[in-house]
Regions:
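Glycine-rich nucleophile elbow surrounding the catalytic serine of serine-hydrolase chemistry
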Residues: 142-154
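Short amphipathic alpha-helix adjacent to the substrate-entry channel of hydrolases
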Residues: 84-103
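C-terminal catalytic histidine-bearing segment of alpha/beta-hydrolase fold enzymes
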Residues: 247, 253-307
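Catalytic nucleophile-loop/oxyanion-hole region of alpha/beta-hydrolase
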Residues: 82-83, 102-137, 275-281
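A glycine/proline-hinged amphipathic helix-loop "lid/cap" segment
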Residues: 1-64, 293, 297-307
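Hydrolase active-site cap/lid region
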Residues: 155-213
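Short beta-strand/loop motif that positions the catalytic acidic residue
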Residues: 233-235
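Short beta-strand element of the alpha/beta-hydrolase
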Residues: 67-76
Length: 307
């Protein structure tokens, strides 16, 4: 693990931003430009498709997928991002597990506020089940807002009476729209990505006046996680959303959920996106791939060994 690598990533993320609030279009363009700098494996192929009446990206190994499916939810504060901006993450999970992935292009705020994103991700999961895929062969995964969706989509599926997936992997998930975690303030000085003001700005677009005190918006403090599948949460210490992860893990443990809280020191929000640049990113993705391969195998489905 290299302090020099961590410093390089920190400098990249702290590039000066324009003064004053940015428009939604400027925020989206800036995020696309940042994520275009991330490394995508050359051992995958992508295909545009539809899933649950929404556009989606199908990601597969070049030599074809094994018997397992990752339903991947991209990050972006529910306001920006796309399956393409998350391809460094989806692609590395696919390359490491041999599974195929679907990444739905769920609707974004402010044009489509809560609960549009959850409606779309739940619809994507229904579509996989309706196509004949066994829930034991499906895992949810996501980063940031998409990490939050991996939890809230599972809540919505359980409440709808659907069978739950085999496992969940959440990278730096956003899990508390009430913004009550202590790390929102104690970590602001070391977080190179977010400030409280920034997440409250985009969060307000997603809420559109909705009360944040409800499980589908703040699962870290309000959700009953009873019956959830095994859960892996990966988070860095240099992020204001750290307590979203620690509190959700505590809630999961309290109701008997098999949960791994995987905290990496001195790395930023969704540090896994820096695979190939940051040793900790590659190591975390290796752990996530092993977790997925083991859990889908434990559910009784054939699988491809972790590569």
């Amino acid at each position: 693990m290299s302090k020099a690598q961590r410093a390089e990533v920190d400098v990249m993320l702290r590039q000066p931003q324009p003064e004053g609030p940015r428009s939604v279009e400027e925020i989206r363009a800036g995020f696309r430009a940042l994520m275009a700098r991330m490394t995508v494996p050359d051992t995958i192929r992508t295909t545009r498709t539809t899933l649950g009446n929404r556009p989606a990206l199908r990601v597969e190994p070049h030599d074809g997928p094994g018997a397992g499916t990752i339903l991947y939810f991209h990050g972006g504060g529910f306001v920006f991002g796309s399956p393409e901006t998350a391809l460094s993450l989806t692609g590395h999970l696919v390359a490491r597990t041999g599974f195929g992935a679907h990444s739905p292009d769920y609707r974004l705020a402010p044009e489509h506020p809560f609960p549009a994103a959850i409606d779309d991700t739940l619809s994507a999961y229904r579509a996989l089940l309706d196509s004949g895929e066994a829930p034991s062969s499906i895992a949810f995964a996501g980063d940031s807002a998409g990490g939050g969706l991996s939890i809230t989509t599972c809540l919505a599926a359980r409440d709808a009476g659907l069978p739950l997936p085999a496992a969940i992997v959440a990278f730096s998930p956003s899990l508390d729209a009430t913004r009550t975690g202590r790390s929102m303030d104690t970590k602001e000085a070391v977080d190179p990505v977010f400030t409280r003001k920034a997440v409250e700005h985009t969060g307000a677009m997603y809420l559109a006046g909705a009360d944040p005190h409800q499980p589908l918006l703040s699962p870290a403090v309000l959700a009953d996680l009873t019956g959830f599948p095994p859960l892996l949460i990966q988070v860095g210490t240099n992020e204001i959303l750290l307590d979203d992860s620690t509190r959700l893990a505590e809630r999961a443990r309290s109701v008997g959920v098999d949960v791994i809280l995987d905290v990496t020191a001195d790395v930023p929000h969704v540090f896994q996106a820096f695979a190939g640049v940051l040793d900790e990113a590659d190591e975390a993705l290796d752990r996530a791939a092993l977790f997925l391969s083991q859990r889908i195998r434990a559910a009784g489905t054939p699988h491809t060994s972790t590569k």
